[in-house]
Amino acid sequence: MSSKKVIKTSNAPDPVGPYNQAIKAGDFIYCSGQIAIDPALNEITCLGDIEKETIQVLKNLAEVLKAGGAKIEDVIKTTIYLTDLRNFQIVNKIYSDFFNIENTPARACVEVSSLPKGVLVEIDCVAFLD
């Protein structure tokens, strides 16, 4: 029987709704969507700048993964939510710099009408610990 554990760290922003930063279930870590909130300030300092937002989102995800005992190389699936698919190539560039190209996870990218706090990008992920 697998166990379920809440993952929480002060090195990533608190959730903006009634959910946890991540849940570890067995050998998997399910990270909730991260937006570009700077955890040190608990605010968005780069609103409207897709490059800076994406970098902050990926940093936040890395911190949540670390709190769960995982690293970015353990990510097996991501979902990217964009308010404008014209930002797709910019996000791809930053994303490819962040993930090892030989070990990039499976991924979906979808356009949505809006995201919390008016951000341009949100990313969630699933990691596998072996």
Which role fits each region the language model picked out?
Residues S2-D130:
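Short, polar/acidic, helix-capping and beta-turn segments at strand->helix junctions
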